[in-house]
Amino acid sequence: MNAAVLLLLLALAALPASCAPPRSFRLELASVDASAADAANLTEHELLRRAIQRSRYRLAGIGMARGEAASARKAVVAETPIMPAGGEYLVKLGIGTPPYKFTAAIDTASDLIWTQCQPCTGCYHQVDPMFNPRVSSTYAALPCSSDTCDELDVHRCGHDDDESCQYTYTYSGNATTEGTLAVDKLVIGEDAFRGVAFGCSTSSTGGAPPPQASGVVGLGRGPLSLVSQLSVRRFAYCLPPPASRIPGKLVLGADADAARNATNRIAVPMRRDPRYPSYYYLNLDGLLIGDRAMSLPPTTTTTATATATAPAPAPTPSPNATAVAVGDANRYGMIIDIASTITFLEASLYDELVNDLEVEIRLPRGTGSSLGLDLCFILPDGVAFDRVYVPAVALAFDGRWLRLDKARLFAEDRESGMMCLMVGRAEAGSVSILGNFQQQNMQVLYNLRRGRVTFVQSPCGALR
């Protein structure tokens, strides 16, 4: 063999995993309650009730905050990620040499990858054994002077000889996780990636992930997220209904795609809001309920009116219907949150939606939902839930309409004899959240290079 060719092959073999040709990786998304110790005894009703309860707790953590930590060397004003208590879907990964296998909650609304580490002085209870960094031969704490450490909003220098990067990662609602920022080998299936930065947490307070999770894997748009560190340009997932015991799918890399010939496919541009730089943020233009256009409150600084001509799969509106497009995208934007089960609409939008649904459905309202939901209708005696009329609702994102049928809007509360809206009310002026109930049995593709999200209403089996 030619000596030059041999040297080239040796050089290519020595390249880190991040420099290798683009590949694809597939992970199973397990429902958090399917992994619970009492999973076998949980009914579909209880599975749904638990997911809704976690969503409400998670909502309480959305907001703006200034990260603060004792002896902080750097503190900047930025958005704080949503508190991790939602954690609806879990993935199995490995870290270190030899690989320590751990389970983590995935989160599209935060960036940091972290797991609890020994010795832990203030950790929440977890089912898996805790990672011991001293056992891993490839573990290395990052120095405080490193560029990676500078990516953290709040960090400080350790007091040991190497002045390791000590972080305080703050979620909204004053939930925090603290520890050492380090690098180690990350294992996804049969593939290993060297030098992946992650948080080795030794203290967590506030909203903790469920005990089935040893930490969190952030899939957000920031530099410390899994997709950013692996240079993944696209990823896709498909989620089963929240009360289902069937796992979902997550595909990272070039194979992540949505059916190109599907008639019920829409591609929506992702926007960047300076308040939420790590979130997958969509510009919410308006809503349609059946054939009726919903007028957004005239409380923004600028508005523009556009004819509501909706491509498939949106409901066909009246030719004269109009949807109000909001110029102030910061107020009426929506973030995609895989870890929240129900969708939350900004207060004024939610109130309008409720009023219009009451007019359309024409059933008596019920109270005291055992699921903990706000808007419920009493089902007529002898009439099955699947036979009750519910108008389709469409969300407008930059003029592209995402249709939500009854299965993605309402859930049956069998214990109360009602059907209840799987949409909640967020605070006035807050950002809206697109939850996973509205994304069920739908392929969701994130194309980070082109800056768009594609929704395809297709069974999860079609995502290979």
From Swiss-Prot:
Pfam families, per database record: TAXi_C, TAXi_N
Disulfide-bond pairs as recorded: 117-123, 376-420
GO biological process, one term: regulation of programmed cell death
Gene of this entry: AP37
UniProt xrefs under SUPFAM superfamilies: Acid proteases
Domain Peptidase A1: 89-456
EC top class named in words: hydrolase
Signal peptide per UniProt: 1-19
Keyword Disulfide bond attributed: yes
Positions with biased composition (Low complexity): 299-311
Region (Disordered): 299-319
Protein family membership: Belongs to the peptidase A1 family.
Name by which UniProt lists this protein: Aspartyl protease 37
Catalytic residues (positions): 107, 337
Protein keywords: Aspartyl protease, Disulfide bond, Glycoprotein, Hydrolase, Protease, Signal
